Amino acid sequence: MTEPVELSVELIACSSFTPPASVAWDTDAHGAEALVEFAGRACYETFDKPNPRTATNAAYLRHIMEVGHTALLEHASATMYIRGISRSATHELVRHRHFSFSQLSQRFVHEGEQEVIIPELINEDPQLRSLFLRAMDDNRFVYNELLNALEEKLEGEPNALLRKKQARQAARAVLPNATESRIVVTGNFRSWRHFLGMRASEHADVEIRAVAVACLEKLKQQAPTVFGDFQVETLADGTQMATSPYVTDF
């Protein structure tokens, strides 16, 4: 029986920073946010912090976002491992070309026991949920039947790995958009902010918006100043969105 799966977003990597011993400079931050500040101060040789209004790391980072000097954010990056995301949502995700992606392969991984993501509008209605899951079970049956028939058709191929790959790459054509995928996503902080501005918006698809808000929560833990301007709100339907006064590039 087809099983639904919940969204899981984990931050698995984030930029670290080792200040050069040759530069007389210190900061009250560390890691990615310290790196961004260092890059900015390197542009103007302001390691002595001549402006008291931007002497702290938080004040400095807020200033660069206020004036739009967000190219500095490209020096820091974060990597997420996302599971419990539908294949259709990953199609939206991979449109963000400044990210780097490594996605679960349907050619090499058997999808006969696939888990699925149920759209909330369907999931909240017992009758629609039942209909949806029956459709997924029927789809899985067809996929497995096709896969078995294709492997028999290719039995003359001596390479077992190639035989399975060829069968799966043909059978996957019937897999639904709701099929769970798993994907590793790496992006610099500027790219993550652009993604959040577009996909955490109330106008975005519900699933990709949930992914964006989950990513935001992880990013805030690592870089609270860089991402702290995004405010999460709960909409009338119970879903969440996030907005920032600094995000205008859509």
From Swiss-Prot:
Gene Ontology MF annotations: flavin adenine dinucleotide binding; NADPH binding; thymidylate synthase (FAD) activity; thymidylate synthase activity
Catalysed reactions listed for this entry: dUMP + (6R)-5,10-methylene-5,6,7,8-tetrahydrofolate + NADPH + H(+) = dTMP + (6S)-5,6,7,8-tetrahydrofolate + NADP(+)
InterPro entries assigned to the protein according to its UniProt record, in alphabetical order: Thymidylate_synthase_ThyX, Thymidylate_synthase_ThyX_sf
Binding site for FAD: R95, H96, R97, Q103, N188, F189, R190, H194
GO annotation terms (biological process): dTMP biosynthetic process; dTTP biosynthetic process; methylation
Pathway in which the depicted protein is active: Pyrimidine metabolism; dTTP biosynthesis
Cofactor comment: Binds 4 FAD per tetramer. Each FAD binding site is formed by three monomers.
E.C. code: 2.1.1.148
Active-site residue list: R199
Enzyme class: transferase
Start and end residues of each ThyX domain: 7-233
Motif (ThyX motif): 95-105
UniProt binding sites for dUMP: E92, L93, V94, R95, Q103, L104, S105, Q106, R107, R172, R199
Obligatory cofactor(s): FAD
Pfam assignment, any one: Thy1
Keyword annotations: FAD, Flavoprotein, Methyltransferase, NADP, Nucleotide biosynthesis, Transferase
Coiled coil: none
Job description of the protein: Catalyzes the reductive methylation of 2'-deoxyuridine-5'-monophosphate (dUMP) to 2'-deoxythymidine-5'-monophosphate (dTMP) while utilizing 5,10-methylenetetrahydrofolate (mTHF) as the methyl donor, and NADPH and FADH(2) as the reductant.
Subunit structure: Homotetramer.
Protein family according to the UniProt entry: Belongs to the thymidylate synthase ThyX family.
The protein, known as: Flavin-dependent thymidylate synthase
Organism: Corynebacterium efficiens (strain DSM 44549 / YS-314 / AJ 12310 / JCM 11189 / NBRC 100395)
